[in-house]
């Protein structure tokens, strides 16, 4: 709702309240409307958050293009939302061809997203959904692909200048049977430890932090993923 409309609605509500009071004796009207714009309710609140991912626009039936006008409309809507934090998830496998990292593959989509965040000072949590980063059945991590993932984010931050990327989310919902980790904490932690080393080797120590597990938790029985990550991974996650 635009601020002007919100202000009008607030005034209308106050007028209705005062009108109701006017219909009664002054002694019976003790309602007080107070707006405190100075007190901070929660200092940890940083604002709205958005999930905004780049997707392939070719599904085998012709490529779909996003026009400049469409991008402008999207930007305008985001400006209205004023997000302070945006999660951007990709698949490293999408930028690897014939075993080599192809940094420019799909960049025309990703650049619009990161460009918006960089220009507006929005903090980005970049990440990989987890596909092929590990083999839960074999209990192994794909170090080659993790190397590519680290090199890719280092290129985005260093060469392309997207230092809005402050965090990295390795594997979506690792506690789930549907995830690449298949609920195996030790396997996920092994990948996190290795990847942290690769980020540091790429010069991202102190620049990009690995986040704890974005575990899908619907009850207290899965909360141990967070506490165990804190206890066992320490400063490898930030």
Placement of each model-derived feature along the sequence:
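Hydrophobic h-region of N-terminal signal peptides that target proteins for export
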Residues: 12-22
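N-terminal amphipathic/basic-hydrophobic helices that include classical n-h-c signal peptides
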Residues: 1-2, 168
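Non-catalytic accessory regions flanking glycosidase/transglycosidase catalytic cores in CAZymes
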Residues: 21-167, 176, 182, 186-220, ...
């Amino acid at each position: 709702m635009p601020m002007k409309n919100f202000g009008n609605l607030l005034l209308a509500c106050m007028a209705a309240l005062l009108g109701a009071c006017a219909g009664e004796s002054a002694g019976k009207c003790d309602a007080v409307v107070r707006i405190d714009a100075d007190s901070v309710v929660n200092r940890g609140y940083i604002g709205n958050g958005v999930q905004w991912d780049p997707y392939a626009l070719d599904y085998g039936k012709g490529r779909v293009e996003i026009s400049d006008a469409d991008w402008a409309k999207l930007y305008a809507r985001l400006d209205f939302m004023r997000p302070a934090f945006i999660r951007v998830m990709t698949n490293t496998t999408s930028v690897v061809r014939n075993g080599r990292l192809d940094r420019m593959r799909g960049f025309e989509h990703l650049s619009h997203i990161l460009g918006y965040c960089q220009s507006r000072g929005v903090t980005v949590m970049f990440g990989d959904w987890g596909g092929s980063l590990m083999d839960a059945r074999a209990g192994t991590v794909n170090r080659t692909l993790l190397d590519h993932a680290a090199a890719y984010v280092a290129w985005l931050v260093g060469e392309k200048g997207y230092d809005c990327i402050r965090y990295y989310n390795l594997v979506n919902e690792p506690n789930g049977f549907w995830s690449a980790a298949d609920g195996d904490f030790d396997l996920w932690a092994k990948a996190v430890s290795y990847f942290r080393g690769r980020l540091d080797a790429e010069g991202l120590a102190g620049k990009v932090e690995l986040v704890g597990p974005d575990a899908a938790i619907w009850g207290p029985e899965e909360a141990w993923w967070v506490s165990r990550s804190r206890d066992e991974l320490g400063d490898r996650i930030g």
